[in-house]
């Protein structure tokens, strides 16, 4: 079964999503969907709280499958019609606040409107009725009710569920088409990003019909089952700072300078005091990371438009601030030891070994009552972002040498380790461990690292050697003695670490 049109019963629906029929029954009628949720609040930009209802376990997995199936169905409809609407820009692959803002760049007038209590507007009956009556689905009543049961919490689409975004977009398509028709009537461009509606135009005489447009649009929105938040309705002129979904769009797309400066100040407060505020309330480091990531998203977009060079050695001021934050979060203020490995597969092997020997390394790993392993260390995960900001390759031991330079300041712009020691007045919370393969031959990563010029004095080198411990995990004792002799040439001491199943072979 590969299409929604083929679903006639609850069992058909379970087969369609490839979930056991008895599991679907258990979720819906035994444990019941509402029992899978946990609710919490996150701060909004204006200081208010946003309520998040997040599902877990089997229900969350089921919602992910439903969302993916709906997205595939939506794409097939667009393909059949030979079109892809450019109205909605939220919750869709390839679209973002940037693509939404780009439509309204460099316009004479911009009108922003907001739908009040957006997700609460999609109640159980509305969700059920959509899948039962919409021409793209026309599902049986029983199946439509099941979808609403899976998707709703306390009778409404919850903000925080994987299936809520795609369902809200599907239901809003009718509203979007009607609003687009009105927008064209008044010679306006129209886009929607979730609950944010934006209209823009270069038409000089739009002000003459502005009140009629707002009145007609508001009436249509009310008829569609939504409410306009009048406090957020605003018309912005070209000679003012025009913002669309948080981005300035007067000439080029950019982030509000006040937002950038405030983020920089928050980071400095975190570095110097260990804490910071957002809108007067205590905040956490993940929120600050979100702000830096938001700013960087716009820099990335603009970098693609110019012909300048952009890499770890050609960063703008905002990117340098983000790089400093990345170092602080991952290499200075991390709460558990961090292990950096040579290759991508090393982490997989290390985790497998620790899980097998977890009883002998309780300081590194433990197993809880449910049988889940809990690591007390973290493994560094490389990404394109680390390559861009730090010049670290996605694989191989040379990247560790590059990382080490940011601890010494040699061959890079800044010694971040000394910088954070100075401004924080605190020591590094946990160690960073560079884990190399025990290959000291020429052209091997370990040899290159040992030859690295850290830019320190002979006295500092000797202190470093005295404090440095190289722990080797050799295949044989003969191999250990061989590498120990080679390391002695560098003035380094070495110890061996043997796993229990190796000790027999080394006696």
Give the location of each predicted region.
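Short Gly/Ser/Thr- and Asp/Glu-enriched loop/turn motifs at secondary-structure junctions
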Residues: 191-195, 230-231, 334, 429
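Catalytic micro-motifs at enzyme active sites that drive phosphoryl/nucleotidyl and oxygen chemistry
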Residues: 94-103, 186, 324-328, 420-422
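Glycine- and acidic
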Residues: 48, 113, 157-161, 331-339, ...
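Acidic, divalent-metal-binding catalytic cores of TOPRIM
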Residues: 310-507
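The start of beta-strands in P-loop NTPase/AAA+ ATPase cores
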Residues: 107-109, 190, 241, 337, ...
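Right-hand nucleic-acid polymerase module
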Residues: 1-43, 52-76, 80-121, 126-140, ...
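Catalytic palm active-site di-aspartate
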Residues: 112-116, 160, 164, 186-204
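Helix N-cap motif at beta-to-alpha junctions
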Residues: 203-207, 440-441
